[in-house]
């Protein structure tokens, strides 16, 4: 028997939940910033997308580049970084999604690399992962870059040059 809980709106089939709460949120970096070499967290200039986007469900929170989840569940996380290289070729340009399940130790949970063959090049790198959030107080994510030399992480308040997108795809 299919029922809908009057208090929560949860759809049940013989007492088993068959529909999970929906959530989609998207954030971007609004101002470009040059980053030094090595692995560097993207900690500044984050804002929620406000161009042709509508938040679905609950919203993520961000503090110094660390994103906290409002509810438990399984999340698809997609990230992209647009780099501008202005000092020669780069052997690698990395977009890394890091996660923690203890609010302390971060590990790579998604990542991808590209390279730049010259000066004054724009390069887009994207990464994605699935993250099982079982505790909203301890599970968090952040976006990091990795490259030799310097490069500028491109920002924009009009569209998503450097951005992170969260979609809740199911219950944990």
Model regions and ranges:
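Short, surface-exposed beta-strand/strand-loop-strand elements in extracellular ectodomains
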Residues: 89-101
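Self-maturation zones of extracellular/virion spikes and adhesins
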Residues: 6-8, 35, 92, 121-122
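Short beta-strand-plus-loop segments that form exposed binding edges in beta-rich domains
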Residues: 143-150
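Short beta-strand/loop motifs in extracellular/secreted proteins, especially
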Residues: 91-93, 139, 162
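Terminal (often C-terminal
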Residues: 15-89, 110-113, 151-172
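A short, structured loop/turn motif at beta-sheet edges
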Residues: 70-72, 99-104, 132-140
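Short, surface-exposed tryptophan/glycine-enriched loops
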Residues: 118-140
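Beta-strand-rich receptor-binding modules of extracellular spikes/adhesins
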Residues: 1-18
């Amino acid at each position: 028997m299919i029922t809908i809980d009057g208090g929560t709106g949860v759809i049940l089939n013989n007492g088993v939940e068959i529909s999970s709460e929906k959530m989609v949120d998207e954030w971007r970096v609004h101002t470009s910033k040059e980053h030094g070499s090595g692995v560097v967290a993207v900690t500044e200039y984050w804002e929620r997308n406000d161009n042709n986007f509508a938040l679905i469900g609950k919203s993520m929170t961000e503090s110094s580049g660390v994103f906290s989840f409002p509810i438990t569940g399984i999340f698809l996380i997609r990230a992209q970084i647009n780099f501008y290289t202005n000092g020669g070729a780069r052997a690698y340009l990395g977009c890394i999604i890091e996660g923690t399940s203890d609010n302390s130790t971060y590990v790579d949970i998604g990542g991808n690399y590209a390279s730049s063959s010259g000066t004054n090049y724009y390069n887009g790198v994207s990464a994605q992962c699935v993250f099982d959030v079982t505790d909203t107080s301890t599970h968090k994510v952040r976006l990091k870059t990795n490259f030799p030399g310097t490069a500028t992480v491109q920002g924009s308040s009009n569209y998503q040059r450097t951005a992170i997108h969260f979609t809740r795809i199911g219950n944990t």
